[in-house]
Each structure stands twice: as structure tokens, then as C-alpha cells.
């Protein structure tokens, strides 16, 4: 699972998910990509589950690029704790995803293999996604 080695601040505000992705929304490395259609927080565990699914299905020959990184800490308070006494401690990490963001890219495999691998990975995601192809053929 991915998480930052060190951050400037341990805790962050939750923020809001507004607008569409202006960066990371074109296929840059591979030939096929999985693109988000909804805004969401995707956890490091979900990213890892998708990565495992794609690498298992693509086998050898395929190269995978993960275009998102979980850099936002999500804090949680211990169970049955009274209100007050500050913000909880960081529990897990998420990546903030806006519509249009490329999540995974895959190259070096056939279209059928890429479609099947991305479909399996899409089932691991908490959002609607679609398969996109690079225009440089």
C-alpha cells in the first residue's frame, strides 16, 4: 500500500469535491486507461486492490502505471470516545479523485486483455469508471 514518507502537516481538513479534473486527465504513458466519472476519495487499499487485479490479469508483457497517489490523511477517533479533546489520529490515506481523472494506465497488451483487466479493476473502485484509449495509435 502507498502512503507518503513524510508530510508537512499530520492532519488535513476534509475539503470538498467540486468541479472536474484539470490535471491528469489525458492518457500519457500507456495505450489504455481507466478514467473516473465521479468524484470520490479512493483509499490506498482500493488502489492496491485494483493494481493487483490488473497485474494478475495482464500477466507478463503488460506495463502498468498508477496515476494517482494517496496523499490525504483521514483521521478517526477511537471508538466510544467522548466529544472534544482534539482531532483523531490519522488512520488511512486517500487520493482525492475528480471526474475525468486517469487512475490506471496499461500498455503492452492487446485490447481484449486490457478491457478485461480494467473491468476487474473497475469493480474494485467505489465510483463509476470508463476505459479510454490513447489517440496516438
From Swiss-Prot:
Residue intervals passing through the bilayer: none
InterPro entries from the UniProt entry: Ribosomal_uL16, Ribosomal_uL16_bact-type, Ribosomal_uL16_CS, Ribosomal_uL16_dom, Ribosomal_uL16_sf
Alphabetized Gene3D superfamilies for the sequence: Ribosomal protein L10e/L16
Keyword set includes Transmembrane: no
Biological process, per Gene Ontology: mitochondrial translation
Superkingdom of this protein's organism: Eukaryota
Subcellular location: Plastid, Chloroplast
Annotated keywords: Chloroplast, Plastid, Ribonucleoprotein, Ribosomal protein
Known partners and oligomeric status: Part of the 50S ribosomal subunit.
PANTHER family per record: 50S/60S RIBOSOMAL PROTEIN L16, LARGE RIBOSOMAL SUBUNIT PROTEIN UL16M
Protein name: Large ribosomal subunit protein uL16c
Organism this protein belongs to: Adiantum capillus-veneris
Gene name of the record: rpl16
